[in-house]
A protein has these predicted regions:
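Short gly/pro/ser/thr-enriched loop/turn and capping motifs at secondary-structure boundaries
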Residues: 48, 110-111, 214-216
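Metal-associated gating/positioning segment near the N- to mid-region
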Residues: 17-53
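Hydrophobic "anchor" residues on beta-strands that sit immediately upstream
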Residues: 6-8, 40, 79, 101, ...
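Charged catalytic cores and adjacent phosphate/nucleic-acid-binding surfaces used
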Residues: 1-11, 15, 25, 94-99, ...
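Histidine-centered catalytic micro-motifs
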Residues: 8-18, 42-47, 136-141, 210-212
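Extended substrate/RNA-proximal surfaces in nucleic-acid metabolism proteins
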Residues: 51-176, 229-231, 251
Length: 251
């Protein structure tokens, strides 16, 4: 049984750096403290459109989170990271080579969804792993929009299961995303619940992300706690509940 007090980390949050979120880094950190979290990952979208100033700002904000802000905030570990995008070219990747947490997900900004197939998405995730990404964000999202929305629920699930198989075989973290449930865009909640059952059978390691775009959402996982308990997902496979592993990875 997973309880709210068991969760000591939020591995997916956004701040005003993401341009469409509403809270600052400081507000998110304060919110994490209020929920008694010990770890918060700041994973603002990595836009990196090629502009020299923007490239510099993207890298600098990630490095500053870990090198400076983390040391100024006692009692909580601030993980400097970003939410990267499938199909995106990462500029100056050598400056990010020491980044421990490298999540990536499917977003419409860097791909043409209408002309993207399920196989294409699978191949993009595989390529992302080869490029050093060790966590896959919200794998249940966007599938209903691929290939002009022609895929059935069952076809989407088969594609998602292939991604899960790959993650299991290559020691990749899979995200259970709180906002996929409460937003439920195109049956994302149903796909998430379905793939979690399959991931449990495979013994996949997962992490919880609020995908907070407002500080009040940081560390708030009521829907995921309910779903994970219904499925009886093993607590030992959930990063957010594993203090020893979090310390090993981020301290």
């Amino acid at each position: 049984m997973i309880k709210e007090k068991d969760i000591i980390a939020d591995m997916h949050t956004h701040t005003t750096f993401s341009k469409h979120a509403f809270s600052s880094v400081k507000e998110n950190i304060n919110a994490a403290r209020e929920r008694k979290l010990k770890y918060i990952a700041i994973t603002d979208h990595y836009f990196g459109n090629g502009d020299d100033i923007e490239k510099k700002n993207e890298v600098n904000r990630i490095q500053y989170l870990g090198l400076r802000i983390n040391h100024m905030e006692p009692g909580i570990t601030v993980i400097g990271s970003a939410e990267f995008n499938l199909g995106q070219e990462i500029y100056t990747p050598e400056k990010l080579k020491d980044l421990v947490w490298r999540p990536i997900g499917l977003h419409s900004w860097f791909v043409d969804r209408d002309n993207l197939t399920i196989d294409d998405v699978y191949n993009l995730f595989v390529e992302a792993h080869y490029n050093g990404h060790n966590a896959f964000h919200h794998i249940e999202r966007e599938f209903h929009r691929l290939n002009h929305g022609l895929y059935s629920f069952e076809e989407c699930m088969e594609g998602i299961k292939r991604i899960i198989d790959y993650a299991h075989d290559n020691d990749i973290w899979l995200e259970a995303n709180e906002s996929s449930i409460f937003e439920n865009d195109g049956q994302s909640a149903e796909r998430l619940c379905e793939w979690l059952k399959y991931a449990k059978e495979k013994g996949c390691k997962i992490f919880l992300g609020s995908d907070a775009h407002y500080c009040g959402e940081v560390g708030y996982f009521p829907n995921l706690i309910r779903v994970l308990n219904e499925i009886e997902y093993p607590k030992e496979l959930i990063l957010n509940c594993n203090r020893e592993l979090l310390e090993k990875m981020f301290n």
